[in-house]
């Protein structure tokens, strides 16, 4: 039988940098996992307060 592709649920979206499915930051259509986001957030223009 042919494999079906999921079109909904948590596993559909992946990090566009490393492919991880957990801890995804989807706000502002960023689609990065939290690990990748922490590494490149400053380069994207985000600033860390205190």
Swiss-Prot record:
Coiled-coil region(s): none
Pfam families the record matches: Ribosomal_S14
Organism: Methanosarcina barkeri (strain Fusaro / DSM 804)
Protein name per Swiss-Prot or TrEMBL: Small ribosomal subunit protein uS14
NCBIfam families (UniProt xref): PRK05766.1
Residues that coordinate or bind Zn(2+): 15, 18, 33, 36
Cofactor binding: number and manner: Binds 1 zinc ion per subunit.
Key words, A-Z: Metal-binding, Ribonucleoprotein, Ribosomal protein, RNA-binding, rRNA-binding, Zinc
PROSITE patterns, per the entry: RIBOSOMAL_S14
A GO MF label: zinc ion binding
Reported function: Binds 16S rRNA, required for the assembly of 30S particles.
Family note: Belongs to the universal ribosomal protein uS14 family. Zinc-binding uS14 subfamily.
PANTHER family the record matches: 40S RIBOSOMAL PROTEIN S29 (PTHR12010:SF2)
GO terms under cellular component: cytosolic small ribosomal subunit
Quaternary context: Part of the 30S ribosomal subunit.
Gene Ontology biological process terms from the UniProt entry: cytoplasmic translation
